[in-house]
């Protein structure tokens, strides 16, 4: 579910390149996304309309028959002195047209790559966030089928074998180098991997997660090098449709629980602030047994708010999440208040702690859009 808005943002930026749309559109990206997504025709693209068989590692790689796709990693790391970090590395692929261009110019490719890289330095109370955007060009940006890889210059997400991953991103003195190994099974979200976002036919995605991957590697900040280890979360999603016009945004939660379980839930919000009936998620217990969650299975209560000094947007901060079917009554708190992306598109995405009955119960990531 994470970062659907960022995939839509690619439409705005790429159409500026291809069709010389005035740059003032990105001053109001919420409106621009709606307008320009409509201009980018769905015709010729595959749609997520029914269940499918997932095959790994093939499905870790790109699905160019669909308009949008992303590889999303977040995680929590500690160095040898127990200094904590949170990270996000997400690479998006977006197709502007189903038919390949006949232009002789390589710059007229319909494939666009967008990257978001963030590091939350918890002890230093600093959120580092960077964005990159490029058309798919040889040696610059693109995807590979075998072994699976997606890259944007030197930002790379790639498989080193059928199970393991390597992540690399560096910018302005902030660097992430990680090797990841799965520590949990793949979770197919929604209806065996078909995640419906509304009642409209085809307004859905194929969506799976790997809620727990063991991570080790290095974090570099300016002149300091930190050998780190921890755990990561992978979300993979591809689709052709966007959200419906009635849906203003979402609150997305991905929690790695201390007992070995995991919880993912996204609350789709209407423009009047109400919850959409297509809000959904899943809970996996310590044995790996999965429970599919519907909108009325989860209760979410915001504990407070935080106003961004960058965008003046007001976000909820701190949550109580109740899942009676899983016997969960959790409290979430941001590890840093300011984990807002305030570049071309503003949203809040950051590391959180999880407690239950006053005791530490895990770590997670939260994404908030449409505020």
Regions found by a protein language model. Name each.
Residues 1-371:
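Structured soluble/peripheral alpha/beta segments that form catalytic or ligand/cofactor-binding pockets
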